[in-house]
């Protein structure tokens, strides 16, 4: 993952990786460092990224080859904590942490992922019904002012002293300099720029 991900991967593969040939949210079989891989053009963080799936026996050699190929850009591994923060800054949801069994695409502003004009598919009827209903609550990104403490995940959200939702994810963004997160908020108040209260502290619904 990173701004040079495509250039780095191209050094290890003869297969075309340009954005026209291999666009976002597509997958294909390519050869990387001599290993056949299922490559997926997507990212968990807000950067150009690829997922590579290949036999575990090739993992050490692949790791070494990627780090060697990336020396000109001074690439470095990053851990789970950094990944989870970057995904939150991007607004990328984690299934089961930010969602539950009642979640549908319209509740999380991901209606673009559903094509209801396709022929019948498993779950289509339920999605059609969900589309017709205004969701009771909506998942929104939020942010606090610099210097404020990061609220714990699971903290209640209130508006005007009334229960209005709950925090699903929260982290201190060291790049932005303030806490950020995701929360379920009653839909009528889930508007960009709106003010919510998390654990007694004010937060702003982000775009």
Feature locations, PLM:
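Glycine-rich, acidic
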Residues: 1-131, 135
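Glycine-rich, small/acidic residue-mixed loop/short-helix segments
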Residues: 103-207
């Amino acid at each position: 993952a990173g701004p040079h991900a495509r250039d780095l991967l191209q050094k290890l593969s003869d297969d075309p990786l340009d954005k026209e040939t291999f666009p976002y949210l597509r997958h294909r079989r390519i050869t990387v460092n001599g290993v056949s891989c299922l490559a997926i053009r997507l990212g968990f963080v807000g950067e150009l990224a690829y997922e590579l799936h290949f036999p575990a026996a090739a993992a050490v050699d692949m790791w070494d080859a990627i780090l060697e190929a990336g020396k000109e850009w001074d690439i470095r591994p990053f851990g789970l904590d950094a990944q989870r923060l970057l995904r939150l800054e991007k607004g990328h949801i984690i299934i089961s942490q930010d969602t539950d069994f009642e979640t549908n695409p319209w509740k999380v502003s991901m209606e673009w992922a559903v094509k209801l004009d396709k022929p019948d598919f498993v779950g289509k009827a339920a999605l059609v019904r969900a589309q017709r209903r205004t969701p009771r609550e909506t998942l929104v990104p939020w942010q606090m002012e610099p210097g404020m403490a990061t609220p714990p995940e699971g903290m209640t959200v209130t508006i005007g002293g009334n229960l209005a939702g709950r925090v699903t994810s929260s982290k201190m963004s060291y790049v932005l300099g303030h806490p950020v997160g995701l929360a379920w908020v009653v839909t009528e108040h889930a508007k960009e720029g709106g003010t919510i209260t998390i654990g007694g502290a004010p937060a702003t619904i982000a775009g």
